[in-house]
A protein has these predicted regions:
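N-terminal hydrophobic signal-anchor/signal peptide
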Residues: 1-16, 64, 118-282
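Signature of alpha-helical transmembrane segments in polytopic membrane proteins
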Residues: 1-126, 458
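Aromatic-capped interface at the extracytoplasmic side
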Residues: 117-130, 289-301
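A hydrophobic, helix-centered structural microdomain
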Residues: 262-327, 366, 438, 443-458
Length: 458
């Protein structure tokens, strides 16, 4: 399945690069701009286009759909990656010609990219072969993975049947879906052949008998992919499947993955990234701080007690964006309004400051002190940690690593406080915990910065 998704992504990526380069090349030639800047401009536009479209999540095939939001994000991205070449040519090209070049390049690029996506969507949902999936089991694990496959139509997969020898609590769900249920394990080979099964997912909680395992080995032909349910769940959601058994395996993965070299490299990366971010944004922070100070005379920077790695408390630095207030969320006051930029307590000019996450840049001080990391699970209030730890199973596991300024959960889900959302955020955090590596973390940081500047991070 990874190969199938990768082929689709590669094909779309290559077409995008061709469309961007062609649009830039044609516009440049059409308006007769200086020859010496021709090739550099086309190359720069193409490279920036690749980066921006990736950061705009244009290559998430498993979630691909045609929506107004996607139209907007693509158009916004096309404008973004053409700004830099426009700015570089500003002093060397007649202004009217440059404006016309910029407008025509945006128009041609957007039309080409949108047309390809429309055709890809049409092909995906009308001509691409649907892969039949057989799920071994009918318990809660089977229900969860079946729902994910049914809801993610862009996967082009269909649950063709369940194999089980036990009628459990989710047996009714299986029947309600109208999906065949096979109760005789020894019909496996016949069902795979008859239903043309391409993927088998093992979704049973209990330990399978040796006799049944041997029968599956004999019955499942070559070419049929076999996945454990948690592994398949991670592949199609980017989240960790949380259960008592999976947490045990996560513990072993985490313990065996610990490395002094990784920790040292990550620390160097944290220090370098935090220093660069602080240096680049210092003039902006100074301006915001002065304006906040002039608003009501209160401090520009304040601290909050947060919980970090292994439950250790520390003082986290933040740029104040609200009027002086000792407000802190209590157990009965947790609501989405806690982080709402339209809250009346927010200083008016600080609404964008919060939206772009400039108020969180002072956390670079915590990173330089070693209390936080650039990438990791979001740090939380002490009171909220107590509540979530009591109400959400395995919540403390996310504190096995340093909390982060940004993270996998933040760029995929954003900020949340409701328990159902926190449970989902935990899945993202544990996925990061299992798969963390330095190159991936650099990508998360780049995407987080881009989303923050777009006003969409968190």
């Amino acid at each position: 399945m990874r190969r199938i998704i990768s082929r689709s992504v590669i094909l779309m990526f290559l077409f995008d690069m061709l469309a961007i380069a062609s649009a830039s090349y044609f516009s440049y030639r059409y308006f007769g701009l200086p020859q010496r800047f021709h090739i550099p401009t086309v190359l720069l536009t193409t490279v920036l286009g690749a980066i921006v479209l990736y950061l705009k999540s244009q290559y998430k095939i498993r979630e691909f759909n045609v929506t107004k939001r996607n139209y907007y994000l693509l158009f916004e991205g096309v404008i973004f990656f053409n700004i830099v070449p426009f700015a570089l040519l500003f002093f060397f090209v007649p202004k009217m010609s440059l404006v016309c070049y910029y407008a025509l390049t945006i128009l041609l690029t957007y039309v080409a990219l949108e047309l390809y996506r429309f055709l890809f969507h049409f092909y995906l949902f009308n001509f691409k072969k649907v892969k039949n999936v057989l799920i071994i089991g009918s318990d809660n694990n089977a229900k969860i993975i079946a729902e994910e496959i049914i809801n993610k139509k862009a996967l082009r997969m269909k649950v063709a049947g369940f194999f089980t020898d036990v009628e459990d609590e989710n047996y009714q769900f299986v029947e309600d879906c109208g999906i065949p249920i096979y109760l005789n394990p020894y019909d496996l080979a016949k069902v795979i052949r008859k239903q043309r099964i391409s993927v088998v997912i093992i979704a049973v909680k209990r330990r399978m008998e040796e006799q049944w395992l041997t029968h599956m080995v004999r019955s499942i032909p070559e070419g049929v992919k076999v996945y454990k349910m948690p592994e398949f769940y991670e592949m199609i959601t980017g989240k960790y499947f949380v259960s008592k058994m999976s947490i045990n395996w996560l513990f072993y993965d985490y313990m065996n993955k610990r490395s002094m070299l990784y920790d040292a490299c990550k620390r160097i990366y944290d220090v370098i990234a935090a220093t660069i971010i602080l240096t680049v944004t210092f003039p902006i922070l100074l301006y915001i701080g002065i304006r906040v100070k002039m608003t009501d005379g209160g401090p520009a920077i304040y601290t909050q007690t947060r919980v970090g790695k292994n439950g250790k408390k520390f003082k986290m630095y933040k740029l104040r964006t609200m009027y002086i207030n000792d407000y802190k969320p209590k157990a009965g006051e947790i609501s989405e309004n806690t982080a709402n930029v339209n809250d009346d307590r927010v200083i008016p000019f600080c609404k964008f400051v919060r939206k772009a996450r400039f108020d969180e840049i002072p956390q670079m001080i915590n990173i330089l002190k070693g209390e936080m990391s650039i990438v990791g699970p979001r740090t939380e209030w002490e009171d909220l940690v107590k509540i979530y730890s009591e109400e959400i199973s395995y919540y403390p596991c996310r504190m096995w690593v340093k909390t982060g300024w940004t993270g996998w959960a933040q760029i995929n889900q954003g900020h949340c406080v409701m328990n159902d959302d926190i449970s989902e955020k935990l899945q993202y955090d544990l996925y990061y915990l299992k798969h963390r590596n330095l190159f991936w973390e650099i990508g998360i940081l780049v995407k987080a910065v881009f989303l923050a500047l777009s006003g969409r991070h968190g």
